[in-house]
Regions:
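Generic beta-strand structural signal
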Residues: 63, 92-93, 121
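Acidic-basic catalytic patches of nuclease active cores, encompassing PD-(D/E)XK
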Residues: 1-46, 56
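Histidine-anchored nucleotide/phosphate-binding helix
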Residues: 76-87
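Catalytic centers of nucleases
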Residues: 46-56, 72-75
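Domain-level recognition of nuclease-like catalytic cores that cleave nucleotide substrates
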Residues: 1-8, 43, 99-135
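Nucleic-acid nuclease catalytic cores
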Residues: 72, 86-110
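Flexible, charged surface loops at secondary-structure boundaries
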Residues: 56-59, 87-89
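Conserved catalytic cores of phosphodiester-cleaving nucleases, focusing on short active-site segments
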Residues: 53-55, 61-69
């Protein structure tokens, strides 16, 4: 799928901050490299399940981000649908920043294995705040 120009921007901030309600994600970019920031929900993908954002760093590594309340199953479905429609490159990361506590257990471990095996994607889940560095 081609991402419309109106849905993306290029940023070179040291910290690219994404926030919705109580969940926030910081993409650390200390060398101020160009990062393509895509608003997925409501722009790049209009209908069906979709994550909130996609960041593509200067090495073409994709970072799919879902800022979520408590519904982790829905967050996983949103990331899967977005990767299927927009994913092009590997390595790839998928992030869920949730207000749910705790983010442990067999369901979480199984989801991480599923993403690695089926999507060649490293799934990272955090509570309320997540920070990730440019590769």
């Amino acid at each position: 799928m081609i991402i419309p120009d109106k849905c993306s921007s290029t940023k070179s901030d040291k910290i690219i901050a994404l926030k919705e309600r109580r969940s926030s994600f910081h993409f650390l970019n200390p060398e101020r490299k160009k990062v393509k920031c895509v608003k997925v929900d409501g722009c790049a993908i209009i209908e069906g399940d979709k994550c909130d954002y996609l960041l593509i760093d200067s090495n073409n590594v994709e970072h799919f981000v879902e800022l979520k309340g408590r519904d982790l199953k829905h967050a996983l479905a949103q990331l899967e649908a977005s990767i299927r429609q927009l994913g092009k490159n590997t390595p790839r990361y998928a992030f869920i920043v949730s207000t749910r506590c705790p983010l442990t257990g067999t369901d979480i471990q199984n989801a991480k294995k599923n993403f690695k095996n089926n999507f060649e994607t490293t799934l990272i889940m955090k509570n309320l705040f997540c920070e990730h560095s440019h590769s």
